[in-house]
Amino acid sequence: MATLPRAAPPTPAALLPLPRAAPPLLLAGRAAAARRSRLRARGPSAAARRSWVVASAASSSSRAVVGGVARREAPPAPQKPTQQAADLNHILSERGACGVGFVANLKNMSSFDIVRDALMALGCMEHRGGCGADSDSGDGAGLMSAVPWDLFDDWASKQGLALFDRRNTGVGMVFLPQDEKSMEEAKAATEKVFVDEGLEVLGWRPVPFNVSVVGRNAKETMPNIQQIFVKVAKEDNADDIERELYISRKLIERAAKSFSWADELYFCSLSSRTIVYKGMLRSEVLGQFYLDLQNELYKSPFAIYHRRFSTNTSPRWPLAQPMRLLGHNGEINTIQGNLNWMRSRETTLKSPVWRGREHEICPFGDPKASDSANLDSTAELLLRSGRSPAEALMILVPEAYKNHPTLSIKYPEVTDFYDYYKGQMEAWDGPALLLFSDGRTVGATLDRNGLRPARYWRTSDDFVYVASEVGVIPMDESKVVMKGRLGPGMMITVDLQTGQVLENTEVKKTVASASPYGTWLQECTRLIKPVNFLSSTIMDNETVLRHQQAFGYSSEDVQMVIESMASQGKEPTFCMGDDIPLAVLSQRPHLLYDYFKQRFAQVTNPAIDPLREGLVMSLEVNIGKRGNILEVGPENADQVALSSPVLNEGELETLLNDSKLKPKVLSTYFDIRKGLDGSLDKTIQALCEEADAAVRSGSQLLVLSDRSEAPEPTRPAIPILLAVGAIHQHLIQNGLRMSASIVADTAQCFSTHHFACLIGYGASAVCPYLALETCRQWRLSNKTLNLMRNGKMPTVTIEQAQRNFIKAVKSGLLKILSKMGISLLSSYCGAQIFEIYGLGQEVVDLAFCGSVSKIGGLTLDELGRETLSFWVKAFSEDTAKRLENFGFIQSRPGGEYHANNPEMSKLLHKAIREKRDNAYTVYQQHLASRPVNVLRDLLELKSDRAPIPIGKVESATSIVERFCTGGMSLGAISRETHEAIAIAMNRIGGKSNSGEGGEDPIRWNPLTDVVDGYSPTLPHLKGLQNGDTATSAIKQVASGRFGVTPTFLVNADQIEIKIAQGAKPGEGGQLPGKKVSAYIARLRNSKPGVPLISPPPHHDIYSIEDLAQLIYDLHQINPKAKVSVKLVSEAGIGTVASGVSKANADIIQISGHDGGTGASPISSIKHAGGPWELGLTETNQTLIQNGLRERVVLRVDGGFRSGQDVLIAAAMGADEYGFGSVAMIATGCVMARICHTNNCPVGVASQREELRARFPGVPGDLVNYFLFVAEEVRAALAQLGYEKLDDIIGRTDLLKPKHISLVKTQHIDLGYLLSNAGLPEWSSSQIRSQDVHTNGPVLDETILADPEIADAIENEKEVSKAFQIYNVDRAVCGRVAGVIAKKYGDTGFAGQLNITFNGSAGQSFGCFLTPGMNIRLVGEANDYVGKGMAGGELVVVPVDKTGFVPEDATIVGNTCLYGATGGQVFVRGKAGERFAVRNSLCQAVVEGTGDHCCEYMTGGCVVVLGKAGRNVAAGMTGGLAYILDEDDTLVPKVNKEIVKMQRVNAPAGQMQLKGLIEAYVEKTGSEKGIAILREWEAYLPLFWQLVPPSEEDSPEACAEFERVLAKQATTQLSAK
């Protein structure tokens, strides 16, 4: 065997430059400028300030760069994570996103140019990647290509070796251990497996590299990189050769497990066709690091490239991409369930191609690897088992085919394919752009929601390109014959053997036609048709009551949940947040479900809107045995298909009567006659054994039932969630899970959260028999009948009541799935997407294995006792004749303790209004003596010092500067409340938060007209002072973008991006029309009375790199404002926060689950989000361990009421502290808890003028409160012996457990909260005082530096200029708009800037434009064009000479005009998904759009002169849309929930449409527009007008507008 000595690192001059003439020069200049700016920024502020710079370009300046002075000269290397930091599920520790693409030659001609182009494209997407704390270690970059045989033959010949047999030789790209001895052991072990397999090892080749370009952190973990060549002589078939190499690799991985270096051995690739070069590198240095990639003998017909942005900064070389088959941009949300199900399949997978060796290729997943690595592993298994890459990905990542009229009508075989595999393989669900190649085919596919950008183009010289962005490779546009984009669920493939390019349906039809899937489904799959509900009760009232008591129902559960759902058909809504103790801290018994909190999407993947985007979601589920996924046949279709997992009694009976399922009913009761201790455990073990035996005997359906005609006092029911989870886990561990489905037939399930838990832990369906009986009982009660008879309640039949209940449950399930960004119930089933608070490891290991439970808690015996405490109530002699009210939802005497209670409110009001220290002391004592309510109540401060005089402690005025108020929107609360809070915070130097909804510009200037506490400027307030300002220092950017204008942003000290809200994380919001007064409508650029919808996700944040882009945009328009990102506490938040820090945020806010809300479903308030104590601890520790803590201020909020809360939060690492509900109480809130009704009795949360007039608050009250809190902090610091709050921040060693003994806290472990990862290098004050993070050199600076442009802005003149633009130039014109908005406001600029750009614009082109800015782009643009624009004109046209037809080409990306409040946009060509999403007042014309056009639109006008995608106008409550429908296909694509479709009949509408097209033609020269105007009379009838209710009476929409207007005038006169 021959080896080649490792090459010495070459000199920089020897490195091959990327061949792009203009951009590198431009970028180099910016990089130099960035370095100069860093040098100028050294030294924290005047005293201690540091500036973090992230440059805009794909160059060395594109990474975070650190400069400055800290407590020591050189920052330390990141510490390796401790065991405590790793106390999370491995899955949560690796999240990310990226930029990807491929280049392919249709003639299969290999060339070095392809590799060079791929490297160039990779370099131009550096901004989509991330770097570690050293700002130099890339999160990962890589390239996959064909094996470069010419290069390897050249090497072999130089070594005196024979040339390789290219057909039969495999090449392994191997990461080996660093240690020399371990490396030799690994090589020997590898060779042994190959030899044992009958393969010939030809030799090892050390891969030549240049280590000087590797970052410091990446260098520490850099492997020894070598290639191994093996000959597979025993196989002739090419697929068999690949399969033999796959088996060998699996055997090597298995053999390595017995060695200490097992985790250090990794095959990037092992194939005769493809090879992967990757590492923890930045894009631009991949080609400099691997010297092979500079060698012109490296030739390939294709190349896939990938740049990673990981939220985790600990370098892990193997997780760089591409993987062995895939390059993945996105995140798999269902990964835990996918891994569980793949583990379950290991015993069932069989295929002749494996020749009986299936057991040797297990396991099929690795929880320690990333989601991308596991998806790649599964796809590779299918590929090596005989599937094509396209087929494998159709199985794993199916499109949303159910609501796709084109597929169902034109390609029924494709829908049959998806229906067949729906029952075999749960979808790997989540945002995903997947590029793939097996060496013969290269392609790309997009997830069902289309959540990642994917543009493609084809040239006349036979090249195909796919990339996350356009403009990454210089292109002669005259050669481009096709420009398109992948829409949701779409696929494109290039067959390198035949040169065919297959687009979407062509690919899928070919795959789906291979087998008669439709015939198999018709013959084998049974569909359960809906069965009628029972029409009478089956229990008497006393029996119902006994069951309800035994199974833990309260009167609130029945009246506020079940009955409300039965009556209304939707989940009940409540407000003010969850202020009762966690279940484990409560002194009252709780159902097992209450120990579980739903997880939710934030930052790394988006939530989904289940109401407006329901076409991508499904609750369908199949029952029965899941077959062998590696084989295709009719037996796999032998299942029962359910349309929903919620069954009534008749539907359950149908399942039980299905003989093919061989159903087995298992009773879930345990016997306590021999004592309680151990009985629950023994019964569950026996239950698992019974289930095991039943499945081995052929049962395909296990029904776990607690149904009993006569419950017995000594045989309580096992909590059904515990039974389901235990059997689910047992069957997985014993290889039986695929053989049977689990159905729960239970009394203990009535809320949507209960259903979600059961399904999440393994149940396929649930029959809630007692809840349904409760619905029937309610409907037949005299009270209900009387209410219906008197018109005080909607009239429903007994069947409708049950149907309404199930409808509400199904809607609630969709919402819970959508919070996590999951579309399919089949993917949610068994995915365990919950966090546990209060269950011990014994319980978790038994039934909920893999779920995160950080604080421990109840044992099985304790859980049994809690279960029994409900059960005995039903059988005691003094059993109540009605259900008990536990007070879990509403505060009531004798009920559960609520932190926001009337007594607390009265004591606080007394203290702050009287401004007496002793009154505040009484308030403090009340809080100190309350029952344990939150985790921090279990902790107290201790000191390692003697007390000091309070006079030595920093002042209260200094402390209050760290205080903030929560983001409460003007609209949810009244103007009076909003302004009073802002004035108070400005007086003390703290910060108020605008919340969503904007702000009146009148508030941005200090008051100078105050007399006797009143001001004509703000006449509705009292207690004012001259010098007061009502501006909110923190201005919020939420998903609805309401009120977000350029002027709003430039008047912010800080800008908060609200990702999630503690009381309802993962959900959007809706301001009801009754709260949208004329004033609110003006601020939100809407009409009075129009409901205003905020989407669940930000539609420009689907991943971590998207968040980085929005932060970049905001820094662009206001470079002086710090950008904050608000997250909600959950397991894994530390990893997310690391990504947020790397995304260049200045501040991270952690919110607890107990924060307030104006309105939210009860299940969300109660069951989503976690305590901030855990989230803050994890975030602080993770940031410290990753070397990122100094970059960001940590702010925390959620239930803060006192100085004690501040002190504990400080010790846990927080720099700043947020107060929400208590601030409202201080300004007058009386906790009526009816915020969502608009009937607040004191006008705090109402827009009704007569109620607002009752507002009692004055700013001074809130000032007094915060000063009291600060003095409390001072007194505590003095007692602790510390002079500054700085000195205790992060000092968890100053915390200790209180000596409190509660019934359920005996086994709680607070070790995680008390653990310490060390302190940051800087003090909190230094971190808080550092400069705003910047974008580095940007094109806007060049524009603003132009003397003519500067003069035009300063003196309101007209100027025309032109600039070249590249994809690395992002948010172009945002900085210019900010300068104009700061000087003139949103509408005051009278000058005119006419700027033309030539080239490919980066993301957010033309964002935040103001009137007077006329921007023209000749070329193409990426995502977010016109984001937040308030005026001006934005035109995008292709270059003059193109090889494609402009109206057929995608010319701009996704999510254009997001939140636009004015201006005009004209695009000659097509746009991507979500064009004009949340458009307020912008007018736009485009020649075609993707899905979700005009979503959530509230104003403006959009004209589409071509095809639109699906789900048009979903959530559209204002504005008008005109869409040309030449082929009569639009009607089924429109979401008609709100809008109506009509032809353009109104003369004003015709004029508006024609006028916009005329302007469009003038600006773009569109041939399509010219043709329409030329034949206007023929085209006009082909247009549809989409009209929401708010526009029905407008002159443009109402053909009889004049008559309607006259009628309204007559009515008004009559009224007078």
From Swiss-Prot:
[3Fe-4S] cluster binds at residues 1229, 1235, 1240. PANTHER family: FAD NADPH DEHYDROGENASE/OXIDOREDUCTASE, GLUTAMATE SYNTHASE (NADH). Mostly in green tissues and lesser in non-photosynthetic tissues. The keyword Transit peptide applies. Keywords: 3Fe-4S, Amino-acid biosynthesis, Chloroplast, FAD, Flavoprotein, FMN, Glutamate biosynthesis, Glutamine amidotransferase, Iron, Iron-sulfur, Metal-binding, Oxidoreductase, Plastid, Transit peptide. This is Ferredoxin-dependent glutamate synthase, chloroplastic. It catalyses: 2 oxidized [2Fe-2S]-[ferredoxin] + 2 L-glutamate = L-glutamine + 2 reduced [2Fe-2S]-[ferredoxin] + 2-oxoglutarate + 2 H(+). FMN binds at residues 1176-1233. Belongs to the glutamate synthase family. GO terms for cellular component: chloroplast stroma. Pathway: Amino-acid biosynthesis; L-glutamate biosynthesis via GLT pathway; L-glutamate from 2-oxoglutarate and L-glutamine (ferredoxin route): step 1/1; Energy metabolism; nitrogen metabolism. Its cofactor is [3Fe-4S] cluster; FAD; FMN. The gene is GLSF. Its main location: plastid. SUPFAM superfamilies: Alpha subunit of glutamate synthase, C-terminal domain (SSF69336), FMN-linked oxidoreductases (SSF51395), N-terminal nucleophile aminohydrolases (Ntn hydrolases) (SSF56235). The active site is at 98 (for gatase activity). Residues 1-97 form a transit peptide. One of its GO terms (molecular function) is 3 iron, 4 sulfur cluster binding. InterPro entries: Aldolase_TIM, ET-N_metabolism_enzyme, GATase_2_dom, Glu_synth_asu_C, Glu_synth_asu_C_sf, Glu_synth_centr_N, Glu_synthdom, Ntn_hydrolases_N.
